[in-house]
Amino acid sequence: MQTSKSSLAALTLGAIGVVYGDIGTSVLYAVKEVFGSGHVPFTHANVYGVLSVLFWTLTVIVSLKYVVLVLRADNHGEGGLIAMLALASQAVKDRPRLRGWLLGLGIFGTSLFYGDGVITPAISVLSAIEGLEVVSPHFGKAVIPLTLVVLFGLFAVQKRGTAGVGRYFGPVTLVWFFTIAALGVPHIVGHPEILGALSPHHALGFILGNPGISFIILGAVVLCVTGAEALYADLGHFGKRPIRLAWFSVAMPALTINYFGQGALLLAEPSAVKNPFYMMAPDWALVPLVVLATMATVIASQALITGAFSVTKQVIQLGYLPRLNIQHTSVRETGQIYLPFVNWSLFVAIVLAVVMFRNSSNLAAAYGIAVTLDMLITTVLTFFVIRYGWGYPLALCVATTGFFFVVDLAFFSSNLLKLLQGGWFPLMIGGLVFTLMMTWKRGRELLNDKLREDSIGLQDFLASVQANPPMRVDGTAVFLSAEAGVVPNALLHNLKHNKVLHRQNLFVTVRYHETPWIGLDQRLQVAPLGGDCWQVTVNYGFKNELDLPSALRLMHGRGCELETMSTSYFLSRDVVVPTIGSGMAPWREKLFAQMHHNASGVAAFLHLPSNAVVELGSKVEI
């Protein structure tokens, strides 16, 4: 029991650092942007109304939607939009048109994650360092350079992994939550009447009394739930109970106290609206607070970067992006990975955002559209999971998800007003990533169709080979093929040029499934073909670590004994040549050909030993 309690405490502390770092730093800018927009007349009633709207936004979107409902939709213990997409896809697998529509919707939502991933670190780190302007206006010119230095340092250390410093994320973020709560308490004690804003009637009164203003400021209110989707995305790392415990015992109380402390400060000192978070602190605490806030925002950004690596790897394994260079940064934790291309692409986009928008208020205009659209997509997918996957009554599913859909739609609609002020930026990034994903998926389909058209049946080919057997050499040859049952091009080229066949031959097809994990008992499907040849299908989930040699070692005892030193892997490297009238627009064909050319090699992706790989090339017109 003691071990169980200590494990729960450790997981809860970890969840505080990774899951709630982002939403925990929203106190830096949420209240400032709501009142700083100039849309809300500064009255006591409006302060109560806005605080009530902030509190009930946290309650409805985070506590009810994500913590209570969405966390239940785990896919073999895993969460995140891709896990939800896989659940929804499986739930409607007997409805192919609906399934295709949901897959497109889910992939679009995944693309938007990258748009959010650019804005969130930029606004978080920038707003933390802007605290220096409260210390002294003379620091104003240093804010952007310091922000860029911090961001560069953050991205530069990614290749070393986070195993060493990751243990401090939870404690530092816990200190942050205690600090923001401590900042709010004295101001609430000075104006305890502010706690009356906990009542929903203040939120309803504000919305009904000022419908136009309320609709507009929802675009700023949504800042209080930055990172809410991380609750679900990190489900597989921490589990439901630690995530829920961390929210209700630490994050939610600390956020509420701080927001209400900022509200109490505004009641007493309306001029504090220019930066209410930092102006809650005494002068002596400002510099340490800026340092702590910067550390907290770096941790929050780190969690998002790690999430980008993980999501990209999953999308690659689902077949929506080309293979990329994936480096493992820890010998103990297989999930700790580093993708150089993703890392530096994010960095360039974030630097561009900081330089273009200049301050956190301008970045606040860019934030919201992508994340609220993501929330809408999550709600839609949740409906199909609980209706068709869990079999709940239609009326209950519509009532539950319909309520959240209306809330999400209100926030999304409000954020559309910010489209020209900066909302276009994350949408542009998401749209670009979505175009790349769909082009790659369609291009792979066309490529596989072409290879299938030109292919020879494996059984017939082996029969002809056995009738006129070539010379056999010792060892095992592993031929990789995208399709089972057809002759791999690498085998044809090997016979053409080398005129030999190995003693044992495995024809291997790797399959990626819409489930997070596939156990070792389901890893291989083996079919003997005769003549010491086998057809092998290797199955992976989208979160499994890919290691083909390890998987093939499971062949022992199935009539095929693999010796590592005498096994060779034969791969076909297809050079794609775009042609007119293939099923894609010419520019997409050229884009696919370039993506295919730049994709990292199969050998590294499947962890094949480099000294045992033979790669043979061929041209394919699509």
Swiss-Prot record:
Catalytic activity reported: K(+)(in) + H(+)(in) = K(+)(out) + H(+)(out)
UniProt KW keywords: Cell inner membrane, Cell membrane, Ion transport, Membrane, Potassium, Potassium transport, Symport, Transmembrane, Transmembrane helix, Transport
Annotated TM spans: 8-28, 50-70, 100-120, 137-157, 169-189, 203-223, 247-267, 285-305, 337-357, 366-386, 392-412, 419-439
Protein name as catalogued: Probable potassium transport system protein Kup
GO molecular function annotations of the record: potassium ion transmembrane transporter activity; symporter activity
PANTHER family: LOW AFFINITY POTASSIUM TRANSPORT SYSTEM PROTEIN KUP, OSMOTIC STRESS POTASSIUM TRANSPORTER
Pfam families listed in its UniProt record: K_trans, K_trans_C
Function: Transport of potassium into the cell. Likely operates as a K(+):H(+) symporter.
Signal peptide: none
Membrane association type: Multi-pass membrane protein
Annotated compartments: Cell inner membrane
Top-rank taxon: Bacteria
Family stated for the protein in its record: Belongs to the HAK/KUP transporter (TC 2.A.72) family.
InterPro entries xrefs: K+_transporter (IPR003855), K_trans_C (IPR053952), K_trans_N (IPR053951), Kup (IPR023051)
GO cellular component terms attached to this protein's record: plasma membrane
